[in-house]
C-alpha cells in the first residue's frame, strides 16, 4: 500500500472516477485532558486504488512548553495530518477507545469536492491552525469541510442556532470530565463567565458525540429540492470493550488538596 502522504497527492485526480467512500469517524473518550471529549476524523476509501486514509485535525506536539495550560486557554497549534486507516485503528484499539463510522451519503461530485478541500487544507502552508477548544477544533473543522462540499444545503433535524439547549460550555465540560477532577479544575480556572451562558446546538457540536448525533438526523437537500439522509450507515468499527469508567483518574482531588492547606 502506498504511504499516506503519497495517497494524498493522488486523491483529487482519482476521486471522480474511482469507487470512493467517505465517512465521519467518532472516537470514544480517553483519560488525558485532550481526549476527554472524544475525537473526530474523516476516513477516505478508494477501493479501485487501494487507498484507505484518515484525515485527522487533531495532530499536536504534546511536548510543547506548557501544553496543558495553553490547551485549556485555547492557545495551542494543531494541524491536519493524514495516516493510513490501519495505523489509526490500531492506535485507538491499543488506547482502548472505540471508534464509530458514519458513511456519508454524498454524490460523486460531493466526494470529489470534499477530498479536494481536504487535500488543499493538507498543503504545508495550510495544515497548521490555532486550536480553540470550543470554536475551532478537531470536530468543527471536519463538519465545516463537509458542509462546504455539499451541493445544496445540509439541514439538521433541530434548530441549530436557537439558544434552546439549556446547557452551557461549562455544563458540557463537567459532563465529559466526570472522574477527572484535576482536568476539570484546570479548565474551570481558564474559562471566563461566558462559559456559563446557554449555547445553541451548533456550538455544542464542538463535542464529537453531539456532532455524531446531529449528523445521524441531518438531511442533504440538493438544488432541486430533493432530500436524502446525510448518513447512509453507522457502525462501530473499533470495539475494545472499554468504558469511560476505565479511564477515571485516581488519587487526591482538588478539594482534598485544598483542605490540607486549611
Where are these regions (language model features)?
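Bacterial Sec-dependent N-terminal signal peptides
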Residues: 1-11
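Internal catalytic domains of large membrane-associated glycosyltransferases
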Residues: 7, 14-17, 24, 116, ...
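Glycine-rich catalytic cores of cysteine/serine-nucleophile enzymes that process amide/ester linkages
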Residues: 18-97
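Second-shell loop/turn segments in exported
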Residues: 30-31, 97-105, 124-133
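Extracellular structured ligand-interaction cores
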Residues: 39, 52, 101-103, 139, ...
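A structural motif
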Residues: 106-119
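Activation targets extended, charge/polar-rich intrinsically disordered C-terminal tails
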Residues: 120-262
